[in-house]
From Swiss-Prot:
It is found in: Periplasm. One of its GO terms (cellular component) is periplasmic space. The keyword Signal applies. This is Tol-Pal system protein TolB. It comes from the Bacteria. It comes from Shewanella baltica (strain OS195). InterPro entries: 6-blade_b-propeller_TolB-like, PD40, Tol-Pal_TolB, TolB_N. Residues 1-21 form the signal peptide. Belongs to the TolB family. NCBIfam families: propeller_TolB (TIGR02800). Keywords: Cell cycle, Cell division, Periplasm, Signal. Part of the Tol-Pal system, which plays a role in outer membrane invagination during cell division and is important for maintaining outer membrane integrity. The Tol-Pal system is composed of five core proteins: the inner membrane proteins TolA, TolQ and TolR, the periplasmic protein TolB and the outer membrane protein Pal. They form a network linking the inner and outer membranes and the peptidoglycan layer.
Amino acid sequence: MKILAKWLALAVLLCTTPAKAALDIVITEGVDAARPIAVMPFVWQGPGAAPQAIADVVMSDLVRSGTFKPLDELGLPQRNIGTVAQFQANSWSSVGAEALVLGTVKPYGTDQYLVSFDLIDLVKAQNQALKGPVSATEFLMDSRQTVISAAQFRQYGHRISDIVYEKLTGIRGAFLTRISYVVVNHTQKAPYQLMVADYDGVNEQMLLRSPEPLMSPTWSPDGRRLAYVSFENKKAEIFVQDLYTQVRTKVSSFPGINGAPAFSPDGKSLAITLSKDGQPEIYIIDIATKAIKRITNHYAIDTEPSWYPDGKSLIFTSERGGRPQIYRVELSSGKVSRETFEGEWNLGGSITPDGRSMIFVNRTNGKFNIARMDLSTRFMQVLTSTRLDESPSVAPNGTMVIYGTTYQGKQVLAAVSTDGRFKARLPAGQGEVKSPSWSPFL
């Protein structure tokens, strides 16, 4: 009990350190093992300079996925081509890439642009070329065109990335998603800031600024709302905020701890931690009616609830076995079972969207790392190699995890692929950033 109590206290204290508002992704591992792909600069078919380089967005997305490695443009056998009609299969025989993305951009009325792109299967194109002349339909994996405004260039670049990623992997892309996190800057009168940004840290927006700590933001399943803990009234309270209307609703303000909110899969309830009856326990609260139901009842601390995708069970962190471990409770029967056994501590768990794995913080030999456990085989893989990792949040397609860690004495955000190959940092230049949460598909 003392160990988990100290961990809970540390979580509060860690919300009192300074931060910055812009995030930059620094890839630290995994690019060399990625699959080679060619992305051509989209050909601008208008006067002057192109409004934006949409291909740069696509290349950056594919690199950050940890799955693909765009080739250097200077080494590509063809230049300044934007359509499949200009593609020459024989020229690409020695490139070694599995696919090619190319496209065009041209003016289409006032502040409107027609963006076209093609996705070519290079392996199939070369194999077919060996047999003689072939039709583009035999190796063209996708071809689309869309009219967008100048303000939509980056967003549509993410959309192209989603299409390319899904066509080549069979997994839905998550490049149009967003992240939320907490920033702290003690040079300001209201140092705590709840932020939302695109998954890559661009288009950052501040939702709330407070003189008191903010923590544990989490997304609703429809991506319209955030739940979080605020100490703005000198005590822990849970709020739900609509991202579009900015309307805030206080959901929980009981005496003692009100913490660790997690939306139910239907978005109608929150699993939360309350200490109003003594020890911290897991409860479910109806957001509309505020009706609560107690889920756990134990003398040890129970905290950090997270839902199974089917909404029938919760996992949570408890010290009921002597040290912090992750347990599962079936909501219909109340049956509790221990889920983790390896290492000294295991805590802060969440189930991947496919329901097959659990992502959590594992402590072994005093080091806190992000780990993944296969729920069928119980095989556990430590994904990170740093020391003070916390607050993992899984991308909605289950391929990446964003989490908090410490780098050069500062708390930053970082990302790791769920197979552990790809790693990146999202450092803040002037302080610290923490408590990340990845949105659902938007």
